[in-house]
């Protein structure tokens, strides 16, 4: 196995994607002490699971992948798939609407690696730009919903609704386990939270709440505003009645409609949920879009997902950070408020900037135009004798046409328009920002009607009186020049892959190649409604089929669902399949989930959501699962065992040699094996979890398969299963071609518009390229481990002294002897121009480093030199040259402002602070703020835009 030389880089994408060339790899292998990449694989990967290259020159499982294509060939093939789709005018609605994305946002956010390549802002000092953008998003949602606090995005409307339901379940005064849902909530939303409710023992009662609340106790009420039928209902009295009975109320609200109608917070709602899709984010055959969740401050600690708050840095300057992180799954595990990790940051930024670009009056103007088009449609229908069912509506007109629905749907289709067939008697038509007078005329013609001269007689829906989006952020950036410069100014505050490697362990921050990204803006993909007729999307469906087939071959499983729109949802879907499998066999009592103590907290949080009881399995000092303890737990829980969740390679960054034995022991005890695919970047082409004992895995396309992290989303988390679990994969009420399992996302294929990225990556890499990528990632990690071990001991290695694709550096002895902490080192790396590795996971007081295959040897060496220099600084602290309280590590990061201050009373020089390895080392990164005070931010919770005076 070899890395392609630079001589064929014009045609070989693999050499573009993989950072080290063949000479660099030889250098790394010499340091590691192995002769070749294949020799490295033989020493690192257990022989009983390793897929060696066969006589055909290809590893098993990859032999049916197409040969690698060039970038131009791949784009041509994607173009052909795109052209096979029909871009109809979508007037389907049901939560998905066409929108006009300002080009300044597409070019400067969606197509800008400064925005789409960063990771979740766990290092806030070098993430101030996107944290500010997310605070803008939270302010947007809070203002429009009339509620005090909103989180930094959800995965989609359906999962936001499910989280709203479970939040009310935790927070309500009522001890009941029933939730009442209005009949006019979107069907796909009801399906998603029905999935969530069942394993938690929550009963869902669907009722027409216009007729009042049902008898009996319930903890929550869920309504939609406007409803799926388009109806606008004043829920004020109903909400008061629900409160009087000890229940909380959540409203699924259309944010564009809320510029006109009274917001949920002002009619008494406790929670609002929904999507920001129509704020400049294309439909994309279902996603990705930023969902939202807003509530009253008193419930802030119940809020799932990320929450951006305002704090201060060490100089007292206002600064942004993630707030209340103790709610989250990586800390609270099975007691967390949610299993959500990745959300939809990139799309939240798009929505926030769309609102900034248009402002309150612009958004209101768009809403008025949309409503005017809907009224014109209703007027024409009424004039032609067609019954318009609801008089009060925003954008969707429901027409009663007994016996004519299919005819009308077909007539609209002939005119290039898709409408929504509700049932045998009703058709609904939704207007949006892209709707024109010509579209209205064409739809009316499908009903055998014409535009009416008289206006529609329905009521005025513009009942909102409160102001919104009054902060200067939503008034200053109305010209393209000002918006372009604002976005650039924010991006310059952050470290993304366009500036530096991001060596975050367990995150796989690899290249997101431009050729992979190019097609996600093509309208043949972006303007597809997820419920569009099958005949409109043959190209997308072929792409999905290809990708499912390729992932099956790569993983060794029998089927894949692409519906989960994050790794957390893939985990949930996989565990749900196991849960339903046991139930189908008459063993519903099997509810014990074994999880190693080293596992990521999302595993435990996902298991809890499926109603499983988490039992922790111990690990040895070397990080491996304690087989003796596993056998004890298997024996203790044999009759109730459901599943073992295990990450492979392990969360400790090594290939456990007993993995096949572990899987066999679980199967012998009647359980299933869930192999967490978070670390699949060390397996592709080397070992297949579906062949070495896994029954289920979720994959992270935003890690292993090049979908960008977007600063904290989007992601795609497909779930792969063996044949006995196929029928339990996620289904969907509007996609009968899918299995009949329970949906976990609003759209049948989740965030489908991202799938061309992974399709392109696999198509361009081919079998040999994919295997070489895995081997290079392993080589890079082992090279770092060898170079840094004498400075920062590598905590875990496998049987032959090898790590997998990441290594853990142990700083605990340093902290104990010198007092310098892992936080000090992480913050100091910013002064050297690097993003820190993963801090204190899976072991407190450590750094986990994952270089990926995309980083060059020069970049890896620069990182190592920075770490070695930091070790030298630590030595000076240990020698007493600098005190523990005042040294360049404890003072890090250093801003330009602090270095230019007239007073400098530190024992180290300004030059040592700013340029520790000299000005020629690498381009300087200037953190915009000093170290941020996290405790202050949580004690003084502020989660919306600060007044300008705060920064003066």
From Swiss-Prot:
Report the GO molecular function annotations.
Answer: glycine binding; glycine dehydrogenase (decarboxylating) activity; pyridoxal phosphate binding
Instruction: Briefly state the protein's biological role.
Output: The glycine cleavage system catalyzes the degradation of glycine. The P protein binds the alpha-amino group of glycine through its pyridoxal phosphate cofactor; CO(2) is released and the remaining methylamine moiety is then transferred to the lipoamide cofactor of the H protein.
| Entry similarity comment | Belongs to the GcvP family.
| Catalytic activities | N(6)-[(R)-lipoyl]-L-lysyl-[glycine-cleavage complex H protein] + glycine + H(+) = N(6)-[(R)-S(8)-aminomethyldihydrolipoyl]-L-lysyl-[glycine-cleavage complex H protein] + CO2
Choose one Gene Ontology CC annotation of this protein and give it: cytosol
- This entry's Enzyme Commission designation comes to 1.4.4.2
N6-(pyridoxal phosphate)lysine modification sites are 703
Keywords associated with the record: Oxidoreductase, Pyridoxal phosphate
* Protein name as catalogued: Glycine dehydrogenase (decarboxylating)
Chain's gene name: gcvP
Q: State the superkingdom.
A: Bacteria
Q: Which organism is it from?
A: Mycobacterium leprae (strain TN)
Coiled-coil zones: none
